[in-house]
């Protein structure tokens, strides 16, 4: 890629480009302690909705939104302490879904949760102090992570690309550094 005018790296939260050039991008990576898992449901959700449960082991939040007609995303989040007390580490995906269906039965209104690689994770907060190196510009979650519940790292990368394009047009065809 040495002969390229510009390389846009938008390879996500686990960016290989950011890792390869970490001495230049100077990322700050902080592993957050809350646990979360993504699931789906046929439960209709009109708007982005938060459901909070004050469970016997601590608060649990369900971040929910429609992603297509008749289908909604359910992102469940809780503290590590709450997760451990519920013993989610002992459940497989279906076991976790079953337990969450029990906890959020009222909110699910009789609908089941749908699993698809619905593993429990902890999310890193990433922020790069430098957003470019030579002719490489880093974008989206590779550059700075947003909260996982919004599920729009690709949208953020596109917005970064639009802003960079606007800066290049404004500055004239110059280096990434000047833009």
Q: What positions do the PLM features span?
A:
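Core beta-strand elements of the Rossmann-like FAD/NAD(P) dinucleotide-binding domain
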Residues: 1-6
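Conserved mid-domain beta->alpha element of the FAD-binding
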Residues: 8-9, 39, 119-179
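Central beta-strand plus flanking loop segment that forms part of the substrate or channel wall
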Residues: 14-57, 80
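Glycine-centered loop/turn positions within well-structured domains
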Residues: 15, 72, 162
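Short, flexible helix-adjacent loops and helix caps
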Residues: 22, 86-88, 169, 173
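A generic secondary-structure signal marking the coil-to-beta-strand transition
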Residues: 35-37, 60, 70-72, 134-135
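Conserved FAD/dinucleotide-binding core of flavoprotein oxidoreductases
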Residues: 46-127
């Amino acid at each position: 890629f040495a002969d390229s005018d510009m390389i846009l790296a938008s390879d996500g939260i686990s960016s290989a480009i950011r890792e390869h050039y970490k001495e230049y991008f100077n990322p700050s990576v902080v592993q957050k302690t809350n646990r979360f898992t993504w699931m789906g449901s046929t439960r209709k959700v009109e708007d982005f909705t938060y459901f909070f449960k004050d469970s016997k082991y601590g608060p649990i939040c369900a971040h929910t939104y429609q992603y297509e007609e008749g289908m909604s995303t359910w992102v469940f989040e809780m503290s590590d302490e709450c997760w451990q007390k519920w013993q989610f580490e002992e459940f497989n995906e279906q076991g976790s879904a079953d337990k969450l269906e029990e906890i959020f039965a009222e909110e699910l209104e009789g609908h089941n949760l749908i699993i698809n690689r619905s593993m429990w994770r902890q999310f890193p907060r990433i922020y790069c102090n430098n957003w470019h190196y030579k002719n490489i510009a880093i974008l989206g979650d590779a550059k700075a992570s947003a909260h996982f519940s919004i599920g729009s790292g690709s949208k953020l990368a596109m917005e970064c690309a639009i802003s960079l394009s606007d800066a290049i047009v404004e500055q004239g065809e110059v280096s990434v550094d000047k833009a």
